[in-house]
Swiss-Prot record:
Any Gene Ontology CC annotation: SAM complex
Name of the encoding gene: MDM10
Species per Swiss-Prot/TrEMBL record: Coprinopsis cinerea (strain Okayama-7 / 130 / ATCC MYA-4618 / FGSC 9003) (Inky cap fungus)
UniProt function note: Component of the ERMES/MDM complex, which serves as a molecular tether to connect the endoplasmic reticulum and mitochondria. Components of this complex are involved in the control of mitochondrial shape and protein biogenesis and may function in phospholipid exchange. MDM10 is involved in the late assembly steps of the general translocase of the mitochondrial outer membrane (TOM complex). Functions in the TOM40-specific route of the assembly of outer membrane beta-barrel proteins, including the association of TOM40 with the receptor TOM22 and small TOM proteins.
UniProt topology in membrane: Multi-pass membrane protein
Subcellular localization, as worded in the UniProt entry: Mitochondrion outer membrane
Domain notes: Lacks alpha-helical transmembrane segments, suggesting that it resides in the membrane via beta-sheet conformations similar to those predicted for other outer membrane proteins and porin.
Positions with biased composition (Low complexity): 217-227
Name under which the protein is recorded: Mitochondrial distribution and morphology protein 10
Biological processes, Gene Ontology terms: establishment of mitochondrion localization; mitochondrial genome maintenance; mitochondrial outer membrane translocase complex assembly; mitochondrion-endoplasmic reticulum membrane tethering; phospholipid transport; protein insertion into mitochondrial outer membrane
Domain of life: Eukaryota
Record's subunit section: Component of the ER-mitochondria encounter structure (ERMES) or MDM complex, composed of MMM1, MDM10, MDM12 and MDM34. Associates with the mitochondrial outer membrane sorting assembly machinery SAM(core) complex.
C-alpha cells in the first residue's frame, strides 16, 4: 500500500503533467509490483488529513515490534484533488501490474499574464517528516524548471546515537541528494548526485516507436481536421492498400521497445558501476474491459432490476494479453536478470523472474501472482452506507475491493499479502515464511491500517 506521502506525490506529478514512468529506474516497474511487494512487519497505523488543497498532514505509529512514530507535512503550489481513503480509487493506492501508456512530451502549465507581465510561477512540492524517538528528519523539494526539466532535492538528517565501542567516530549518516530529470517523451535523461559518498550518476532511456499525441493534438483531432487538405493527403490515403503491400501476419505480440543504461562513479569510494536494460511492452495500453465499456444511456434498463446484458457480462477479450518483458545486465557485477509478466485473465496477473551471476553461478527463480477481488454488481450497489456517494451507474463487472499477492522463490521464501478496503480504511495484512526452517517457519507477520480524510 502506498504511504499517504507517496499518494500525494503521484497526484502532484499527475496534476503537473509529469510522467514518472518514463525513467530508467522504473524499467522493471511492472514485474516488481508482482514480485517485490513489501509485506508489513508488526503493527502500523497511519492517519492523514488534507485541510485544504495545498496543505496535508500525516501521522504514523508503529506499535510492534517496537514503539515509534513520525509526523509529516506536505505543501504544494497547485491544488491537488486528494480524495479520502474511503473514496479514492483502490488501484491508485498500491503498486500493481500495468502496461503504461505511450510516452509523451511533458507539457508546461498555461501562461498567465496580468497588465502585460507574466505572473504565473513554476509548480513545486515541499515535504518533511520527523521520526520519533530517533530524531531523524527527511525532506524533499521538487520543482519544474521547464516543461521538460524537473529538479528534486532530497535530504536526510540522522543524528548519531550512542558512543562507538572502539573510540572511533562513526560516519555521519546525513546526506543530501540531487536529481535532475530531462524528459522529452522519446527519451529521458536523469542526472543524480549524492553528497555522502560523492557519487555522480547518469541514466538514459530511449523509447522506440511513436509517441502518444499531446493534448493539443488530441483536441484538434476531436474537433475534426480537414483531411482533404493537401497537408493531410497522407491521412486520407492511410486506409488504401498499396499494390506491393503484404497482408499482416497474424500471431505474436505487437508492442514497443525501450532501452536504457546507467553509469555512476563514486569519487570517495573510487568505484564505478554500469548497467543496461531493455523492455518490451504490448500495445495498446492494458486497460481492463470494465474501463472500455461506455456508461449506459438513459434509455438503458436498470441493471439492478433487469440484470446486465450478456455483452456486459462477457466483455470482448483482449486482442493480445497485456505483457511486459524485461532484461537487465550489469557487466561489472556479472548479474543478469530477465522477467516476464502478463495478465492472463481479467483479474489475474502472473510474473516470473530469473537472476543469474556469471561469476559465482548463483541463481534464483522467483514466481508471483496478483489476483483482484471483486464484489458482485448487485451487492456493490446494495451494500452502500448511508450518506455515501453512490456511482452514477453500477459497474457490470463489480467493484474491486481487494487484491491478493503471492510470491515464491527457489531460496524457500514464500510471501502472501492481502490488501483491501474495510469501510473507510485501507488495510494490508501479510506473512513471510521460510520453508527451509522447521524451528521458525514464520519469519514475519504484520498488519497496516491507513486512514486519511480530505475534509
Amino acid at each position: 500500500m502506498h504511504p499517504f506521502a507517496s499518494y500525494v506525490l503521484r497526484t502532484y506529478y499527475k496534476a503537473t503533467g509529469w510522467n514518472e514512468d518514463n525513467l530508467y529506474a522504473n524499467l522493471t516497474r511492472s514485474s516488481n509490483a508482482v514480485l517485490d511487494f513489501t509485506v508489513p512487519r508488526g503493527l502500523h497505523f497511519t492517519v492523514s488529513k488534507s485541510p485544504n488543497p495545498l496543505f496535508k498532514t500525516t501521522y504514523s505509529m508503529t506499535a510492534m515490534p517496537s514503539l515509534s512514530g513520525s509526523l509529516g507535512y506536505i505543501f504544494t503550489s497547485c491544488d491537488l484533488n486528494v480524495l479520502s481513503s474511503g473514496t479514492v480509487r483502490f488501484k491508485d493506492m498500491l503498486d500493481r501490474f500495468k502496461v503504461y501508456d505511450q510516452p509523451r512530451r511533458p507539457e508546461g502549465k498555461e501562461e498567465e499574464w496580468l497588465a502585460g507581465e507574466r505572473v504565473d510561477t513554476r509548480d513545486y512540492l515541499l515535504y518533511g517528516r520527523f521520526y520519533l524517538p530517533s530524531g531523524r528528519l527527511d525532506a524533499l523539494y521538487s520543482t519544474r524548471l521547464s516543461p521538460t526539466v524537473q529538479l528534486s532535492v532530497a535530504a536526510i538528517s540522522d543524528p548519531i546515537s550512542g558512543t562507538p565501542v572502539d573510540g572511533r567516530r562513526r560516519t555521519d549518516p546525513s546526506n543530501i541528494m540531487l536529481n535532475l530529470q530531462h524528459d522529452v517523451g522519446k527519451w529521458c535523461t536523469e542526472y543524480t548526485y549524492s553528497a555522502e559518498d560523492s557519487m555522480w550518476g547518469v541514466r538514459f532511456l530511449h523509447n522506440f516507436g511513436r509517441l502518444a499525441p499531446s493534448s493539443w493534438e488530441t483536441t484538434n483531432g476531436e474537433n475534426g481536421t480537414n483531411t482533404s487538405a493537401p497537408g493531410n493527403a497522407s491521412n486520407s490515403r492511410a486506409g488504401v492498400k498499396r499494390v506491393d503491400e503484404e497482408d499482416a501476419v497474424e500471431g505474436g505480440l505487437r508492442g514497443r521497445v525501450s532501452v536504457g543504461a546507467e553509469l555512476y562513479f563514486s569519487a570517495k569510494e573510487r568505484s564505478a558501476g554500469v548497467s543496461t536494460g531493455i523492455r518490451f511492452s504490448t500495445m495498446p495500453d492494458a486497460t481492463p474491459p470494465s474501463a472500455q465499456i461506455p456508461p449506459p444511456s438513459p434509455f438503458t434498463p436498470d441493471p439492478t432490476t433487469s440484470g446486465p446484458s450478456p455483452a456486459l457480462l462477457n466483455p470482448r477479450p483482449y486482442p493480445q494479453p497485456p505483457t511486459t518483458i524485461t532484461a537487465l545486465f550489469n557487466p561489472m557485477l556479472g548479474h543478469i536478470q530477465s522477467a516476464y509478466t502478463a495478465r492472463v485473465s481479467r483479474d489475474l496477473a502472473l510474473a516470473t523472474r530469473f537472476d543469474f551471476n556469471v561469476y559465482s553461478y548463483d541463481s534464483e527463480w522467483t514466481m508471483g501472482a496478483e489476483w483482484w477481488l471483486r464484489r458482485s454488481p448487485r451487492s456493490s450497489t446494495d451494500s452502500g452506507e448511508e450518506g455515501a456517494e453512490k456511482p452514477s451507474y453500477p459497474s457490470p463487472l463489480g467493484e474491486v475491493h481487494g487484491v491478493v499477492k503471492a510470491r515464491a522463490s527457489t531460496n524457500n521464501d514464500v510471501s502472501l499479502m492481502w490488501e483491501g478496503r474495510i469501510r473507510q480504511m485501507l488495510v494490508s495484512l501479510g506473512v513471510v515464511s521460510d520453508l527451509s526452517s522447521r524451528a521458525k517457519p514464520i519469519k514475519a507477520i504484520g498488519i497496516e491500517v491507513s486512514y486519511f480524510s480530505s475534509e
